[in-house]
């Protein structure tokens, strides 16, 4: 039952991790109950967030509280102890699908208005837009990020190396970025002296002024910057690179972050779609406009909107799309069997996951023929693209990394209070005319300004001083704790980074850095330095801004461990609480498809095990609950045994899946609790549980595995049926009887 101040909050999210929670949470609650630890839940799923935001449209019994806002407030208190599982960062197609499902279940929700005309439609769109994209993490992340591979996981990877594609020195794979007129080239940055408030305004060529964003506060010593990506240069870049991919006979791919960068990146994606399929848009552009095709939602939107046309006309357009593939370079595929290309849906290929996957697979992606091929990876903006080219160059020269000997690159990331680009959505604008965009303070002084033309993307970012100080402190703390070099990935030739370098140099002397190796290197140089050390089996801490935090905590774990879901991801909240994120991967929709088809869930809950141990440890140190420390230590021991005995889920139906892996964690955890000598009460409590689980192992595993091989009934996709899914995810009555005692 919820209490006024739940001790640990376990989040209900989406897709595979949400299914896993139905099996794992009862085990966690059972094991922690006697230690005076309350494990409560909050629903921050996509469906839950939609329902919470439209109470006025719903019946009383359908309404639920706004858990995300509540957790955002909790994150600013010392009591916060939140275990955060991956959730959907909804693209527009996903948002619409969730709305449609909820409407079918009797929720009287409004449709998502893509082109709102009335005040009411604009308000509805605005409410939905707050739910779309990466709407959860920025609210909860009231601290900086400490992500690393736990020793047990690293040792497991060394003993059980994942496959790494071989690299050839004559690989044609490469990264392509704009030569200029991108965010990197146009960036201007300044540090605020004295608190003020600013507004963003557009000044037209005729001198008329239009307010883009009304006044909002800036704190003393805050770093702000503005930049522009030019539409004309972007379109020329796509034209040139598409032709070059054809000439070099490599796959063409585009790697964006349309989920998090929900204003700018879908627009960039849309330009790529229009340029690649230019013949189709030249011929049918007017019709597409009438049909309401939104190219920013990808080619998939063309396919869904032409569904309403007469068969002959629809087939004519489909044939025209197919004809494009005769003249244009082959596209990298998301699903070659179903003909889903890189350009179908903006959220299908996300740079932080797609680039490491390519780098792990010999620098190749899958082509339309279902085979791997060298690839041109288009990452238009130059801010961070160079790090991926550095990995390609390194692997071409030295070959693939060896997981049995390679070092590790943990990360300390500047993230708190919506730092940098990941907090820029409400300050990003697509301009509809030429002129100047200015950031103007209370006295009317323009702090930053950028010349713009029609279609250009303007962006303003900010990062507050307190998070920067905390970030520098965390970097020194981790360097001291590990004894390995810490490298700030900052480029003195980039405007924003130059401001940050001044601050890093000012705040480092506040800490004892005696005997520590701390460097500041531009991202490409920092990457090369880290790769060389990694090859030699040495560890290097990367200390980065918010975007590189995201990119590197996928890149290095995928190379080191084969996945980013096995990372320990701790956010020491700035007011003393703790946020524990379970891995750095997504919510694995393909895993859900397999459950629906054959009731086998291959989701690996290792991230949840690691986060829970860190959460219990935090609880112990903050409120002095000694039992929590015993639970944490024994859970760590159990996780080590779980890995050593290889009890992670199999991909194949009929074999151990997520549910079976939870049984083994419970068995090893109960055993560790029974054997420990620190707390006699816990040892006495768990000895019979460990004995029962061990004696019934064969029967329980048989019950769990025999439940597979049939369709998994979930009663929904975005809004699961609690009763059905609980039954589905806990099919062993023998196991349940022991756990639920």
Question: What residue ranges belong to the model's regions?
Answer:
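Extended, well-ordered protein cores
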Residues: 2-270, 279-502, 507, 511-529, ...
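Short active-site loop/helix that positions an aromatic residue
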Residues: 275-276
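Ligand-binding pocket scaffold of soluble enzyme catalytic domains
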Residues: 674-677
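Membrane-interacting alpha-helical segments
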Residues: 679-682, 706
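Short, charged, amphipathic alpha-helical segments
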Residues: 683-691
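A glycine-biased, small/acidic residue-tolerant capping/turn segment at secondary-structure junctions
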Residues: 701-718
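C-terminal accessory extensions/subdomains outside the catalytic/core fold
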Residues: 720-741
